[in-house]
Amino acid sequence: MDNVAGIDVSKGKSMVSLLRPFGEVVAKPFSVGHTGSELKELANYLKSLDGETWVVLEHTGRYYEPVARFLHEEGIFVSAVNPKLIKDYGNNTLRKVKTDKADARKIAHYGLVLARGM
């Protein structure tokens, strides 16, 4: 996997963090609304990146479903991961930063680790 997009999905919008192997930042975290046009713009952006891009998001409630479905239908590899796995990943620090950007970055890092094991 050349790029991993970690997506923190909430009602109506998502925060996206894009990383390459070894944690290289592709772009600063950015927000995407759940409208067709914004999701299409996200899909086009992900497809324009060099190499293959894998999207990782938490399997939370029903909010993730339209995002995952849309990106999958656009031909992007999407994985929905149990939120407990994401929560437990990297919990070896005393500093607890809880923002949408930090969550998206954590999901992307988790995806990088998963990709190495594939």
Predicted regions and their residues:
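Phosphate- and other anionic-substrate recognition elements at nucleic-acid/protein interfaces
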Residues: 1-118
